[in-house]
Amino acid sequence: MTATEIQKVLPHRYPMLMVDRVLELVSGERILAQKNVTINEEFFQGHFPGNPVMPGVLIVEALAQAGAIALLKMDRFAGKTPYFGGVDKVKFRRMVRPGDTLTLNVTLDKLKDNIGSAHALATVDGEKACSADLLFLIK
């Protein structure tokens, strides 16, 4: 999926759209996506001047958005709005900086009615940057 196709699925827009491309997608099961981190990201103006680091919470948000795409591509959730229901077991292992390509790998674990859980992993050049268990709510 291209950025234009992603915007047809996710309600997020700049500066909060954190997924640039989808490489692999099995609707309702898993997704492999990317976020190209550039120096032009607004958050780098204050985090941190002279030493830019992507805020960890935005890495988790990117993972959640990727997971939301996997859910919203299911026929029963098309056109709905995804909400972040919770996060658990978050671990940050590597700083993400301008020029990095953040690879987002999300596997949906459970789905009951409009609530889903997933395991998520963000990597840069194959190195773990962040892992988390996510909870989604679709309305």
UniProtKB/Swiss-Prot annotation:
GO CC entries: cytoplasm; membrane
Active site: H47
Gene: fabZ
UniProt keyword Lyase present: yes
InterPro entries according to UniProt: FabA_FabZ (IPR013114), FabZ (IPR010084), HotDog_dom_sf (IPR029069)
Subcellular location: Cytoplasm
Chief location bin: cytoplasm
Superkingdom, taxonomy of origin: Bacteria
Short name of any one Pfam family annotated for the protein: FabA
Family (UniProt): Belongs to the thioester dehydratase family. FabZ subfamily.
Function: Involved in unsaturated fatty acids biosynthesis. Catalyzes the dehydration of short chain beta-hydroxyacyl-ACPs and long chain saturated and unsaturated beta-hydroxyacyl-ACPs.
Catalytic activities: a (3R)-hydroxyacyl-[ACP] = a (2E)-enoyl-[ACP] + H2O
GO terms (BP aspect): fatty acid biosynthetic process; lipid A biosynthetic process
Coiled-coil region list: none
Gene3D superfamilies: Hotdog Thioesterase
KW Lipid metabolism (keyword) present: yes
GO molecular function: (3R)-hydroxyacyl-[acyl-carrier-protein] dehydratase activity
Stated name of the protein: 3-hydroxyacyl-[acyl-carrier-protein] dehydratase FabZ
Known EC number: 4.2.1.59
Entry keywords, A to Z: Cytoplasm, Lipid A biosynthesis, Lipid biosynthesis, Lipid metabolism, Lyase
